[in-house]
């Protein structure tokens, strides 16, 4: 599942640069911005049949690929 999440991040961001360091801050590095973050949420929700309300997503809680993968897994486990 992690690999699928990383593929989605790559598609939305247009780069695989984050794969070199899965704890890289995607916002600080300019890989994600607010618009791409919303696009990422929509893609993840569709791919994994989960709900990721932006109001529950503080930037610090999902600013790295590893944190995004953990959050998606957490939401999948809730279902």
Curated annotation (Swiss-Prot):
A UniProt-annotated Pfam family: PP-binding
Keyword vocabulary terms for this entry: Cell wall biogenesis/degradation, Cytoplasm, Phosphopantetheine, Phosphoprotein
O-(pantetheine 4'-phosphoryl)serine modification, residue list: 34
UniProt record, GO biological process: cell wall organization; lipoteichoic acid biosynthetic process
InterPro entries to which the protein is assigned, alphabetical: ACP-like_sf, DltC, PP-bd_ACP
Any one GO CC term of the record: cytoplasm
Domain Carrier, residue spans: 1-76
PTM (free text): 4'-phosphopantetheine is transferred from CoA to a specific serine of apo-DCP.
Domain of life, source organism: Bacteria
Biochemical pathway: Cell wall biogenesis; lipoteichoic acid biosynthesis
PROSITE patterns: CARRIER (PS50075)
GO molecular function, one term: D-alanyl carrier activity
Compartmental location: Cytoplasm
Family according to the record: Belongs to the DltC family.
Its job: Carrier protein involved in the D-alanylation of lipoteichoic acid (LTA). The loading of thioester-linked D-alanine onto DltC is catalyzed by D-alanine--D-alanyl carrier protein ligase DltA. The DltC-carried D-alanyl group is further transferred to cell membrane phosphatidylglycerol (PG) by forming an ester bond, probably catalyzed by DltD. D-alanylation of LTA plays an important role in modulating the properties of the cell wall in Gram-positive bacteria, influencing the net charge of the cell wall.
Entry protein name: D-alanyl carrier protein
């Amino acid at each position: 599942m992690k690999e699928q999440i990383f593929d989605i991040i790559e598609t939305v961001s247009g780069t695989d640069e984050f794969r070199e360091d899965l704890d890289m801050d995607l916002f600080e590095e300019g890989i994600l911005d607010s618009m791409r973050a919303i696009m990422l949420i929509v893609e993840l929700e569709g791919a994994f049949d989960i709900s990721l309300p932006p109001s529950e997503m503080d930037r610090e809680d999902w600013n790295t690929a590893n944190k995004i993968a953990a959050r998606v897994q957490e939401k999948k486990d809730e279902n």
